[in-house]
């Protein structure tokens, strides 16, 4: 999150808000609720969604964005190099049965028209591309 804020700031853009939804077991809102908030916020022109392997929240948020959001959106999914079936990270995210993989999440995001950064270092560039694609 701090990396995304730093990159956006270095692009000369500000932030209306930064939301950390927390780990898998306990969090204050879903990815979909967060993107809905930013979509409806008049002080937000574009946003970056950061997710991780495990679960299906990013795919659900991507579907919501596809059907409801006209703002530029970029995304990054952490955990692309995580071994299948192994718990990873602070939330103990696990990829099992083909669900929750970084590749599946990235594909769902791309299908929703979201520009996906391959690495954390590319989040700002992905947002710039998303904004350019929307004529900003």
Residue locations for each model-derived region?
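Catalytic-core regions of core metabolic enzymes
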Residues: 1-136
